[in-house]
């Protein structure tokens, strides 16, 4: 039998340390690495083994050498036994990994046995570092694909909203726990960072194009947009999108504390959610509402609280009517919004929003219901 790595166990009475060193030196062209130790404090722990050797449990075993060899190329066990002048059955194939065998020299992986000092090991390489590194790699082994996924989660390239675009169902099943931990790690990391976020307040009558403009802004910025739900938990389905559109936001959906945190540009604060805290990592928040900014904020604040701090955070104010869009920017000196520009409201034209003709309406009804209104009943 040919082996690339092997172990020899030889009684101390059959070979001396000097002889071992001589053999290793003579065969150094064939032997890549070696490590050996004398076990002279082992005891019988198994009653059957002790009886077979005429001993009792607790008696000290005969001193013996453990010799571990790694060759440059495979060697026949017959020749190896001849080198050490021992029987071939004392040359054995290492079961498991070489690193485990190396740690067994000092019984590091068998705490029930006598623990030998690592200084008692004689070797021509850093056996301990190799063994520990191999054990570490196995314990925390990750394939290249998992590593790629985790690094992309940490960098923000993969988020909860686009996770299905980046992994398949098999990867999700295999790596689900690791992926969940990676998202939690990123959340903890985000809490430490300064958030670079802007806030836009858009107001106007229903049908004026507020939501359309909000979506257009997000699209033009290449942001994935989360549009808030109609429930009291407006962030129920938020999954890390770069833009949050609080569409047709009602003042009773948020308390002062949560609104301040949501618009806070200094930290990635957690915002109260019905099921769990949501960490806002968005770069843009857009509020749309039919109410003016003063009426909206006055509904939220108590009489003794100022709305200035929230106006200051909503630096861009956009007012829309059927004809024009008014763009204003917060003036921190005069504490008011300055009108910067008035532009024609072409939102409906730009997005080709129009009413259907009678024929188009009939065609639509037929397409979804298979009802042909031009046929007699």
Swiss-Prot record:
InterPro entries: Helicase_SF3_ssDNA/RNA_vir, P-loop_NTPase, Plasmid_rep_OBD. SUPFAM superfamilies: P-loop containing nucleoside triphosphate hydrolases (SSF52540). GO terms for biological process: DNA replication. GO terms for molecular function: ATP binding; DNA binding; DNA topoisomerase activity; RNA binding; RNA helicase activity. Keywords: ATP-binding, DNA replication, Nucleotide-binding, Plasmid. GO terms for cellular component: extrachromosomal circular DNA. The keyword Nucleotide-binding applies. ATP binds at residues 204-211. Belongs to the Gram-positive plasmids replication protein type 2 family. Is essential for plasmid replication. Nicks the positive strand at the plus origin of replication. This is Replication protein. It comes from Onion yellows phytoplasma (strain OY-M). The lineage of its organism: Bacteria, Bacillati, Mycoplasmatota, Mollicutes, Acholeplasmatales.
């Amino acid at each position: 039998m040919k082996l690339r790595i092997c172990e020899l166990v030889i009684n101390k009475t059959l070979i001396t340390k000097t002889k071992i060193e001589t053999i290793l030196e003579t065969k150094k062209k064939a032997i890549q690495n070696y490590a050996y130790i004398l076990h002279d404090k082992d005891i019988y722990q198994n009653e059957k083994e002790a009886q077979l050797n005429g001993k009792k449990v607790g008696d000290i075993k005969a001193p013996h050498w453990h010799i571990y060899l790694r060759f440059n190329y495979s060697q026949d066990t017959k020749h190896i036994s001849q080198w050490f002048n021992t029987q071939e059955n004392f040359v054995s194939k290492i079961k498991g990994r070489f690193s485990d065998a190396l740690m067994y020299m000092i019984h590091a992986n068998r705490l029930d046995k006598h623990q030998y000092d690592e200084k008692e090991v004689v070797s021509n390489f850093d056996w301990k570092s190799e063994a520990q590194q191999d054990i570490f790699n196995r314990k925390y082994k990750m394939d290249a694909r998992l590593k790629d996924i985790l690094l992309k989660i940490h960098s923000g390239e993969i988020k909860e909203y686009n996770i299905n675009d980046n992994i398949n169902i098999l990867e999700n099943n295999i790596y689900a726990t690791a992926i969940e931990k990676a998202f939690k790690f990123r959340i903890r990391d985000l809490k430490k960072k300064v958030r670079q976020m802007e806030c836009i307040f858009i107001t106007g009558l229903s049908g004026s194009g507020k939501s359309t403009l909000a979506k257009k802004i997000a699209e033009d910025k290449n942001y994935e947009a989360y549009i808030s739900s109609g429930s009291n938990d407006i962030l129920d389905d938020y999954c890390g999108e770069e833009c949050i559109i609080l569409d047709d936001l009602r003042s009773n959906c948020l308390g002062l504390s949560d609104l301040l945190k949501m618009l806070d540009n200094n930290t990635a604060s957690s915002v109260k959610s019905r099921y769990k805290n949501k960490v806002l990592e968005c770069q843009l928040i857009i509020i749309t509402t039919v109410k003016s900014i003063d009426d909206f904020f006055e509904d939220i604040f108590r009489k003794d609280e100022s709305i200035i701090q929230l106006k200051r955070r909503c630096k861009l104010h956009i007012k829309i009517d059927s004809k024009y869009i008014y763009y204003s920017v917060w003036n921190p000196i005069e504490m008011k919004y300055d009108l910067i520009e008035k532009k024609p409201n072409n939102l409906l034209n730009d997005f080709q929003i129009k009413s259907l003709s009678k024929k188009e309406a009939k065609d639509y009804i037929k397409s979804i219901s298979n009802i042909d209104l031009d046929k007699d009943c």
